[in-house]
Amino acid sequence: MTSGAPRRVGPRMAAAARGVGRPLVAAAAARGVGRPLVAARGVGGPLVAARGGGRAALSSAAAAGELVTATACYPPLLPSSTAKSKAAKRRREEEFYQRVLASPSAADKIRLLTKLQRLKYVIHPQTVGVAADRWFQHFTKTAFVPGLPASLPPGPDPGPGLTELKSVVCEALLQEQFYLKKRRPFLYREREQTVLPLIGNLVPRLVSSLAGRNPLLGRSTLDREPQVGFYWSRGEQTVPRGHRKGRVDPIRFQIEDKPCCQIRVPQQLPEFVPLENSIPENVPVIHLEPSRFPLFQRQYENNIFIGSKIDDHACYGHTQFHFASEKLRREKLVKDNLADQIEVRLRANGIGSLFAWTGAQAAYQGFWSEADVTRPFVSQAVITDGIYFSFFCYQLNTLALTVRADQHNLRKNICWGTESMCLYETIEGGDVKGFNDEVLDLLVRFLLNRPEAVETKIS
């Protein structure tokens, strides 16, 4: 560019030449608008403070003692409740837990907990699976203790009372196996035709005979072949196929049980051990899928039921009596070289049946996985094929079996059990030979179990 060429002027230079721009900013500063105002308010960072004296304003505001609150000015940002993200899943779970916790009654809690129907593993306590007791212990977080708890009430003293009870049992045995003429049973139904009437006849007679020693039995309710069910979750698995493929779902279980008869009482039985008591027996941990047991998945209405409605006054369990079906027939298991599975299947039956019944009782009182029990729930069971009797006691210490609730849960449920004992050897000529008094003693001890608050009247 030559020196004689005209110089091009930009817009800013033209505005400055006309007196526009900076004089206006100066005028605004004179009126208290712009950077001096920001500095006076004490708002901004080091850059604003350097330009307009903000640092001095901040120090003066702190000296003035202005209060700064930690309350958020805006509501928190929540994930979408319909998204597929993990945050959205956590939000849905939290909202569901809050709805259940806010439910006013146990019936509403059970309705919400059983509302969603998904595929679940259906457990039948009498099963043909190998090592079924270890699987059932894992599903229910139950530790098995051989023998019976020491806190059971003592049996009756030898005397006229015990002799009378023995005559009641012998008469019931003769009634079903000697006096009555019965038609030829169907195939594999011979024992069922004899044992079911025996239990139905023996239990009411023992209850009525012992009602004078245990007033709780006088206010009890006897159910014949009730439906008992319990629904819960334990563990997690990934959905393998379908429109929900890849989702992580809890492993759901449903126990369907039908005892021969059961006794319900209006008062809860006393605990066998304290709630937080630690026992040396461990709960087996199985890392295989339940389908390897094998268990099969079905989808139908979830059920939590003790054999009566929630409003029934006798809402606590006392003793169940189970018939050992053909799946537990000793002769068949010995013939199939499965003699070692006889006691295993009996233990599995006791653990599964008592967990379902006792867990449903706790659910009737408003407890569930996120609101764990505050007191133990106790039930008893007797499993018999008419000749051999097995006795089990169960104490429910926790319902927190989900992955979320079981992270720091040190409690475990406890089941005590005996090996099967023979009641008698044979019946010949209207006489019961080889009668085992120990079995009768345990039957009486089970039926005499009661809370300490119940008044005892010995007739």
Question: Model-predicted segments: where are they?
Answer:
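Short terminal or interdomain "cap/linker" segment that borders an active site or interface and mediates
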Residues: S59-S60, D372-N436
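Internal, well-ordered interaction modules that form the hydrophobic cores of assembly/scaffold domains
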Residues: V334-V403
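Charge-rich, low-complexity intrinsically disordered linkers/tails
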Residues: T2-P6, G10, A14-L24, G34, ...
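Long, intrinsically disordered low-complexity tandem-repeat segments
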Residues: V25-A50
